[in-house]
């Protein structure tokens, strides 16, 4: 379907107070009987920002239909994978802006197609989500979380584990006011900080942490989470959303780290120089549009970007589309990132 035709059809749907996913979407990528699930394959998709019929707008941001369209594209792409990934991680901003229950009710059956195919779905909270309406929609998370009241999940992926943290800062006086909008910064509440500190002390298996917000924004019992990851041999890397761009950063200081070693030779001073943080693209809202596949083996993780588009605040008609958007999409599609389970292994001198 052409974009203009899609927008015409969805314009009529906006008149309804509660939207439903397009009925045709379930047939776009039908479940194949006997399809193999690969335990060494995962997908990360963040920042869905799907509007399902709740509050319409905040400031300059109008309601748009393209997030629903791109969510269908992403889910269809994942269901077309053969074999299928064992797990799909979604670290937050599922809702359009406010965590309205209409948004979650729209998204649930769309993501439910993954579960129907045998894929495990692991959801997290972003600054545009809301726990009360989320728990009302996905009731199992209130029962399985190890931190009461937070959306926290630990996943055993064989050679490594993943922990989905809840970095939603939900001050009531802010989130309830439509004119002020949701709080943007991330935070781990006290109960989650204490739980995570105790978990980290017990970890003996490579464990990758993830949250909606970057590690540098989060504190754990008075320490910056980025510093904890940098110095802990069992925390090889961090994955987050929020910024809508495929982007890599390091927990070590790259330039200082390659100075002189104690023996007078050039080399890396710290194993933290090999620890990376990956920012995920947005499934649908703005920036890099797509998701990330992840191959898991005994050595580490291999991420690869799958980008369907790139645009600014919103898409524009093809005749008005800036040429550099296509260039950026082409440049960022298919990019790879390695994270190694044991990055602190001794590095030979240069």
Regions found by a protein language model. Name each.
Residues 5-26:
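N-terminal export signals
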Residues 200-217:
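Short acidic, glycine-rich surface-loop motifs adjacent to enzyme active sites
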